[in-house]
């Protein structure tokens, strides 16, 4: 009996060690002398405004967590919806496909969809629209049809958005539209034969030690693309750190070289006239990343 208890304790310790191995290292604040009082002020400032929600805050410096705080009802294991930050994960998958040679940024979007999914008559602009246009939110689709696409289980999301009128020539103007992200997710699936979620779990999440995740799918079984990914605070921090290191994790290249810089560089201006350069919204948009 004693041997069984000792074995169980050893297995429990081993399991705990394995879980902790996936965590980012925590800084010794006494050793580093880092003052975290300003981060406390951020928490207080944000939570004092009834219109804002802050569930958690994690600050990473030099690869170490120097501050983390969770509001009541949340903890380090809580999975939180990333909303539009999910778009950056779709972009990550596109980058992997481009790096593998399975996609090109200048590929025509309509080439990945069946005649049944496309309008009976293809406009010049729809035929012109590329993967890159979708990435930088310049598809020509002005109206976001998320509500319409998600209003019933029978809707074919791709067919619905592709039938939508385009208001400007693709690649010329910025218009934020979450259905661009869904089209990218669908294109990725057609080009690679696997869903964005399957690819990222295998090629990105596994090496980063991200083990808990929840995804939202269309009725067609395709990741929503523009929203609907749930991760823990630390998992999101790991992705940020991966991009800060040009896609390299513990000496291993995860993302194609240069992709991190490419997605984070301004690819299009929200206001080409530059009428309000101090507005963060008009600071430029990358490949599904704000710059």
Give the residues covered by each predicted segment.
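Beta-lactamase-like hydrolase cores
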Residues: 28-59
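Bacterial Sec-dependent signal peptides at the C-terminal "C-region" and cleavage site
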Residues: 15-25
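A small/polar active-site loop signature that marks catalytic segments
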Residues: 139-218
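Active-site helix/loop module of the DD-peptidase/beta-lactamase fold
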Residues: 100-139, 163, 192-227, 231
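Active-site SXXK
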Residues: 63, 80-109, 134, 184-188, ...
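Active-site Gly/Thr loop motif
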Residues: 210-212, 261-291
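Sec-dependent N-terminal signal peptides
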Residues: 4-13
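Active-site-proximal alpha-helical segments within enzyme catalytic domains
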Residues: 180-187, 227-248
């Amino acid at each position: 009996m004693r041997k069984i208890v000792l074995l169980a304790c050893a297995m429990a310790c081993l399991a705990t060690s394995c879980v902790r191995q996936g965590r980012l290292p925590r800084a010794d604040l006494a050793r580093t002398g880092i003052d975290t009082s300003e981060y406390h002020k951020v928490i207080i400032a944000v939570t004092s405004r009834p219109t804002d929600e802050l569930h958690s805050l994690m600050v990473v410096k030099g690869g170490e967590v120097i501050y983390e705080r969770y509001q009541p009802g949340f903890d380090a294991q809580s999975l939180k919806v990333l909303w539009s930050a999910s778009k950056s994960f779709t972009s990550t998958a596109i980058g992997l496909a481009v790096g593998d040679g399975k996609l090109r940024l200048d590929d025509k979007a309509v080439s990945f969809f069946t005649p049944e999914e496309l309008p009976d008559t293809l406009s010049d602009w729809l035929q012109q629209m590329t993967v890159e246009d979708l990435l930088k939110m310049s598809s020509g689709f002005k109206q976001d049809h998320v509500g319409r696409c998600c209003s019933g289980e029978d809707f074919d999301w791709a067919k619905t958005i592709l039938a939508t009128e385009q208001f400007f020539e693709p690649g010329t103007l910025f218009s934020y539209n979450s259905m661009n992200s869904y089209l990218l997710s669908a294109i990725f699936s057609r080009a690679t034969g696997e869903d964005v979620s399957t690819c990222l779990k295998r090629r990105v999440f596994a090496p980063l030690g991200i083990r808990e995740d929840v995804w939202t799918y269309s009725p067609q079984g395709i990741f929503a693309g523009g929203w609907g990914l749930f991760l823990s605070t630390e998992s999101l921090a790991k992705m940020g750190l991966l991009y800060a290191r040009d896609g390299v994790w513990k000496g291993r290249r995860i993302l194609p070289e240069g992709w991190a810089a490419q997605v984070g560089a301004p690819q299009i201006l929200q206001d080409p006239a530059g009428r309000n350069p101090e507005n963060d919204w008009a600071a430029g948009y990358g490949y599904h990343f704000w710059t």
